[in-house]
């Protein structure tokens, strides 16, 4: 049986990232010119590597624009999954991050169970949603190579799922996830001498940006 492989990539640089704006459905206006360039470099690298069996993207514009560029190079369709979206920020969507944090009155990373604005989703609620959909997608693709184009939070959520991390970890540690970076996980045997013993997820690469040349 072939191992299941998961390739996670973050979208290219977006206007909301540059402006420091909360980039939900209202705040996200897509990729910058540089972000489009990053997405093209990402697409060229993915095309040169092992074939991808299935590909998914989050619905936010910056991720979909990245996915469109990648799909053109891979000559394949990419499925948009609503529940892969980043945390819902409610009334904070489209507002400057500095203003949102000031109104919240606390450092968000220290309060993973509290939403930063009315109608928003807490970090712990987001993790519950995203890890469930990641598990669902992977259960449909045993032995396949799966690509997911998402956000920094998507990459972090996968680590929480595979490593059994808790939401409170956000207070003491974080994962660097750069624009258009690649993170790879693969299911490998618990014991190479006894493959029937089961599988576990192994991190092969994290935040790989070797394809970004400028």
Where are these regions (language model features)?
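Phosphate-handling substructures
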Residues: 16, 72-132
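Generic beta-sheet signal
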Residues: 6, 144-152
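Short beta-strand scaffold positions
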Residues: 57-58, 128, 149-150
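Short active-site segment of divalent metal-dependent hydrolases/proteases
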Residues: 14, 154-155
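Glycine-rich phosphate-binding loop signature in dinucleotide/nucleotide-binding domains
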Residues: 48-51, 137-144
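Acidic, low-complexity terminal tails and accessory targeting/binding regions
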Residues: 1-4, 87-98, 144, 160-214
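Active-site-proximal alpha-helix that buttresses catalytic centers in soluble enzyme cores
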Residues: 2-4, 9-76
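Conserved histidine-centered catalytic loops in small-molecule metabolism enzymes
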Residues: 2, 51-83, 105, 186-214
């Amino acid at each position: 049986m072939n191992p299941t492989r998961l390739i996670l990539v973050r979208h290219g640089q977006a206007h909301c990232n540059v402006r420091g704006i909360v980039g939900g459905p209202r705040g996200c206006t897509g990729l910058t010119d540089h972000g489009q360039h990053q997405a093209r470099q990402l697409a060229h690298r993915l095309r040169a590597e092992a074939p991808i069996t299935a590909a998914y993207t989050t619905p936010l514009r910056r991720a979909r624009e990245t996915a469109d560029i990648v799909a053109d190079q891979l000559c394949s369709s990419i499925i948009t999954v609503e529940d892969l979206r980043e945390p819902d920020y409610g009334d904070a969507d489209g507002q400057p991050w500095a203003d949102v944090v000031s109104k919240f009155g606390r450092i968000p990373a220290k309060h993973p169970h509290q939403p930063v604005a009315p109608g928003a989703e807490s970090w712990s609620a987001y993790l519950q949603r995203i890890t469930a959909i990641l598990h669902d997608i992977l259960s449909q693709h045993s032995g396949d190579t799966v690509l997911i184009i998402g956000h920094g939070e998507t990459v972090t959520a996968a680590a929480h799922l595979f490593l059994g991390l808790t939401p409170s970890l956000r207070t003491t540690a974080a994962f660097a996830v750069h624009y258009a970076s690649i993170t790879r996980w693969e299911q490998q045997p618990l014991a190479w001498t006894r493959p029937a013993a089961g599988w576990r997820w192994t991190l092969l690469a994290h935040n790989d940006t070797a394809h970004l040349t400028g």
